[in-house]
Amino acid sequence: AEKYARAAAERRYVEARLAAMEPCEENLLFFEESLSPAALRALAEGGKTRCTGVCAAFCAEDGGYRYVMASETVDLRAAARSINAALSGRGGGASGMIQGSLLASREQIEEYFHGKIG
C-alpha cells in the first residue's frame, strides 16, 4: 500500500510541476532530488509539449544524475551520443525519448542545454 501511495503522490507532484510551467521556445530542464524512474519519465513526457526543444528531467544519484529526455522536434537517438560524450553519460533509446545517467554537475548540464529551468 505504501508503494501505491508514493506512486500516487509522485503523480500528483508531476502534474503540479507541469501545470505550473509556461510554454517556452527552448529546452526545458527539471532537476529533482528523488523521483522514481516512472515519475521522471512522466515529467519528461509531459514537459515535451511545453517546449520547442528537449525536455530533460534529472534526478540526483550517486554523484551524478539519472535522466530522461523527451522531444517532439529533436531526434534524441541521434543526439544521445553527443549528449553522453559531453556530459560523461551512458544511455540511449528511441528518437522521441532517451534515458540513462550522467556524471556531470548541474552547472555543466545547464550550460550544455541552455534551457529554461522548470
Where are these regions (language model features)?
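Terminal appendage regions of diverse proteins
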Residues: 1-118
